[in-house]
Design a protein with these regions (language model features):
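Intrinsically disordered, low-complexity polar regions and short flexible loop motifs
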Residues: 94
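Short gly/ser/thr-rich secondary-structure transition/capping motifs
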Residues: 17-23, 77, 100, 230
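N-terminal helix-turn-helix DNA-binding module of bacterial transcription factors
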Residues: 1-35, 309
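Interdomain hinge and pocket-entrance segments immediately C-terminal to HTH DNA-binding domains
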Residues: 22, 31-45, 63-65
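Bacterial carbohydrate/catabolite-sensing allosteric modules
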Residues: 17, 58-63, 81-90, 105, ...
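N-terminal winged-helix
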Residues: 41-58
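Short beta->alpha connector loops
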Residues: 73-76, 99-103, 224
Length: 311
C-alpha cells in the first residue's frame, strides 16, 4: 500500500529523534549494490600508496562510491583477514596491491569467485588474470643502471625486493640485463633481497661493505632501503656520491631534503590512482562487457639528484 507523505514525515522524525542508523549490509543485500569499494595496500605510511589512494578516492567519490581502506603491513595473514572483512561488508569490488609476504593467491581467487571486480595496482601476479595498473619495472631498472654507468660506476649493487613478487622480479631482471649490456659482471654477492624497510637497507649496506671489493654504487628497489643505506654510509664516513653513488625507488618526500638528496624513481602515483579507479568504474558500468583484461603499464621517470651525479 502507498504510504502517505504525512506518514513518511512522521516516520522520518521518529527516526531522527531515535538517532536511527540504517543497516548498511541489509540495504546492500536488498539493492545488490553497496557503493563501497574495498582497497588493500601494504602500508599507509608510504607516500606512494597514500597518494595513489588519495587520487583513487577522489575519482571514486565523484562517481558516488565510498572507499574502505585497509593495510596489510606486508603480512599475508592480515591481507587474508582484510579480504574477508571487505567481502563481509558487501563491497562492490576490491582494488589491491599485494603484501610482500603474499605467495598464495587463494584469497584473491575468492574475490574473483564472488563475481565482483578485482583490480591490482603496482604489485600483482599474472596468474590471477585480472586488470592491472603499474609501471614498466624492467625498463626502469635498465634506466637506473644506464645512469649509474654514465656516471662512471662499474660495480653496482642491488638491494632488491623478494623475488616471488612480480615487480621486484622485473626490477632485478632489468638490472641484470643492463649489466650484461654494458659488459659489467653479475655478482650474486652484490644482490641482497629484503623487505626494503629502513633497517633492511642498513643491514644490506653493512653486508655490502664487508665484501673484499666493495661496490661503487647502490641501486635500492625502495627509497626507505636507500635511506637506511645512506645512514650507514654517513656513519662510516663514505662520501656520497664521490665514493659511492646511490639511487632509490618511489620518490618518497624525504628523498628531496635529506643530504645529499637521493636520486629516485617517480612512478606517477596520481596517474596510477586515477587509471586504477577508472578501470574499476568501467568494470562496474559495463558488467556484461566481454572480458578483455586491461594491463596498463606507465613509463616511470628517473629523478637525478646529488646522490648519484658528478661522481
Amino acid at each position: 500500500p502507498r504510504i502517505s507523505e504525512k506518514t513518511k514525515i512522521a516516520v522520518q522524525q521518529v527516526a531522527k529523534n531515535l538517532n536511527y542508523q540504517p543497516n548498511h549490509l541489509a540495504s546492500a543485500l536488498r539493492k545488490g549494490k553497496s557503493n563501497l569499494v574495498g582497497v588493500i595496500i601494504p602500508r599507509a605510511n608510504s607516500n606512494f600508496f597514500s597518494s595513489v589512494v588519495e587520487k583513487m578516492e577522489e575519482v571514486l567519490n565523484s562517481h558516488g562510491y565510498n572507499v574502505i581502506m585497509t593495510q596489510s603491513n606486508e603480512s599475508y595473514e592480515k591481507e587474508c583477514r582484510n579480504i574477508d572483512a571487505l567481502l563481509y561488508t558487501q563491497v562492490d569490488g576490491v582494488i589491491a596491491s599485494m603484501a610482500n609476504e603474499t605467495v598464495e593467491l587463494e584469497y584473491y581467487q575468492k574475490i574473483k569467485s564472488k563475481g565482483i571486480p578485482l583490480i591490482l595496482f603496482d604489485r600483482g601476479e599474472n596468474d590471477l588474470e585480472v586488470d592491472y595498473v603499474g609501471i614498466d619495472d624492467y625498463m626502469t631498472s635498465q634506466m637506473v643502471v644506464k645512469h649509474l654507468v654514465e656516471e662512471g660506476c662499474k660495480r653496482i649493487a642491488h638491494i632488491a625486493g623478494f623475488q616471488h613478487s612480480r615487480i621486484y622480479k622485473n626490477r632485478i631482471r632489468g638490472y641484470k640485463d643492463a649489466l650484461v649490456e654494458f659488459d659489467l659482471p653479475i655478482s650474486k654477492d652484490l644482490i641482497i633481497e629484503s623487505n626494503l624497510g629502513i633497517d633492511d637497507g642498513r643491514r644490506s649496506m653493512k653486508k655490502l661493505l664487508e665484501l673484499p671489493i666493495r661496490p661503487d654504487a647502490i641501486y635500492a628497489a625502495g627509497d626507505w632501503a636507500a635511506l637506511g643505506a645512506l645512514q650507514v654510509l654517513k656513519e662510516v664516513g663514505i662520501k656520497v656520491p664521490e665514493e659511492m653513488a646511490l639511487v632509490g625507488f618511489s620518490n618518497e618526500p624525504f628523498t628531496s631534503f635529506v643530504s645529499p638528496p637521493i636520486s629516485t624513481i617517480n612512478q606517477h602515483n596520481s596517474e596510477i590512482g586515477r587509471i586504477t579507479a577508472e578501470t574499476f568504474l568501467d568494470r562496474m558500468e559495463n558488467p556484461s562487457k566481454e572480458v578483455t583484461l586491461n594491463k596498463i603499464i606507465l613509463e616511470a621517470e628517473l629523478i637525478i639528484r646529488q646522490s648519484s651525479k658528478n661522481k
